[in-house]
Amino acid sequence: YPRDMMRKVKKATEIVGPTYIHAHAPCTTGWGFDTSKTLEIAKLAVETCLWPLYEMENGEITQVRKIKNPRPVEEYLKTQKRFKHLFTMEGGEEEIKKIQAIADWNIEHFGLQ
């Protein structure tokens, strides 16, 4: 979501005093995916609700990008070699359920739907 990032950076530069931007930056080498997939993987992180896009001011959430139909976390995990073991090892299914629970918590906590 490049426009979202640009808007947030612009807003941060207009604030007097400190600001903080926590950006999601997929790593092609460490995560094991082709460079051409960088934006797709970054968007999947948001669309699976593993990486919520939101803003806070003075400790309060002020804006949240809603996700009408969250995608299953498997779609995000399968794109990266670092998660390959979850789909081949015994007990991997349980670990994926735990990761899905994180996304579900994000949906509830941040009001993503």
Regions found by a protein language model. Give the residues of each.
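Conserved thiamine diphosphate
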Residues: Y1-I15
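Structural beta-strand/beta-sheet cores of well-ordered domains, especially the beta-sheet scaffolds
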Residues: V16-T19, P52
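Short, conserved beta-strand edge motifs with alternating hydrophobic and charged residues
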Residues: Y20-H24
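Flexible, low-complexity linker and terminal segments
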Residues: A25-Q113
